[in-house]
Amino acid sequence: MKRILIIGNYIFGRKYMEHSKRLGYEVILAATTAEEELSITEKSNIDYYIQIDYFREEYSLAKITEFYRKIPFDGVLAGHVFLPSLVNLVSKRLNLPFFGTEAIKNTTSKEKTREIMKEMEMFEANYFKFSSKDE
């Protein structure tokens, strides 16, 4: 059975947990919340839990790596927009698929994302950039 690690139980993370379970994955949640404080819904959508600290990346990486040695997983997702760098670190160190730092830099800015999508002819809508409050 495939396993997925989701770092962060914010709105994206909760959605990823639900979808992953529906797709038949075993779900591992890594979050700062104490396990006993997880909601009933969160608990029903996970198979394993790792308590980490989002702002202490090396500490979190060590906890996740220790878990991975016992129970390997196939991929990692970020459960919030501020977590891709931690996901990238974990994925790189554990030799798992990842988006890469350049992709993270380009997709955490809506403006950069829109420009790239427009270049790739994936973005049909017009959007406007303002350079001052007067515009």
Which sequence ranges carry the predicted segments?
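Active-site nucleotide/adenylate-binding loops and adjacent lid/helix of ATP-dependent enzymes
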Residues: 106-135
